[in-house]
Amino acid sequence: MARTKQTARKSTGGKAPRKQLASKAARKAAPSTGGVKKPHRYKPGAVALREIRRYQKSTELLIRKLPFQRLVREIAQDFKSDLRFQSSAIGALQESVEAYLVSLFEDTNLCAIHAKRVTIQSKDIQLARRLRGERS
């Protein structure tokens, strides 16, 4: 076979493989310890943000119906015994209570942000109620 002259070609910019450090090579060569896999963990705050988005989208009631009904009956007993409630009345009470709590927590969060915090505290709730005129 006749020898042919080789022509010069432009390089494609590929890099030559580099030598691995001894510690990396040792880590790759060593077998994994017992095959125990760590459970997957989300970054701090990621799950909380997902829950916030989920509950902001939803419209269902968040307080369970029967415990709320027992609480209403217990409070009503202090005013008059043997009171009866329509189920629609309990439902209306629960809707209004949850709407009140959501708006209170929104105002409480604003108070915490104003204090340059991200965690709400009892003093934030007290301030929000005081600004609303609910408590002197």
UniProtKB/Swiss-Prot annotation:
Places the protein is found: Nucleus; Chromosome
Modified residue annotations for N6,N6,N6-trimethyllysine: K5, K28, K37, K80
SUPFAM superfamilies reported in the protein's UniProt record: Histone-fold
Gene Ontology CC: one annotated term: nucleus
UniProt PTM: Phosphorylated to form H3S10ph. H3S10ph promotes subsequent H3K14ac formation and is required for transcriptional activation through TBP recruitment to the promoters.
InterPro entries: Histone-fold, Histone_H2A/H2B/H3, Histone_H3/CENP-A
Modification sites for N6-methyllysine: K5, K10, K15, K19, K24, K28, K37, K80
Positions where N6,N6-dimethyllysine occurs in the chain: K5, K15, K28, K37, K80
Residue ranges, annotated region (Disordered): 1-42
Positions where N6-acetyllysine occurs in the chain: K10, K15, K19, K24, K28, K37, K57, K65
Stored CDD domains: HFD_H3
Residues with PTM Phosphoserine: S11
UniProtKB keywords: Acetylation, Chromosome, DNA-binding, Methylation, Nucleosome core, Nucleus, Phosphoprotein
One Gene Ontology molecular-function label: DNA binding
One Pfam short name: Histone
Subunit structure, as described in the record: The nucleosome is a histone octamer containing two molecules each of H2A, H2B, H3 and H4 assembled in one H3-H4 heterotetramer and two H2A-H2B heterodimers. The octamer wraps approximately 147 bp of DNA.
Family designation: Belongs to the histone H3 family.
Function, as annotated: Core component of nucleosome. Nucleosomes wrap and compact DNA into chromatin, limiting DNA accessibility to the cellular machineries which require DNA as a template. Histones thereby play a central role in transcription regulation, DNA repair, DNA replication and chromosomal stability. DNA accessibility is regulated via a complex set of post-translational modifications of histones, also called histone code, and nucleosome remodeling.
Protein name, per record: Histone H3
Species annotation: Ajellomyces capsulatus (Darling's disease fungus)
UniProt lineage: Eukaryota, Fungi, Dikarya, Ascomycota, Pezizomycotina
Gene this chain is encoded by: HHT1
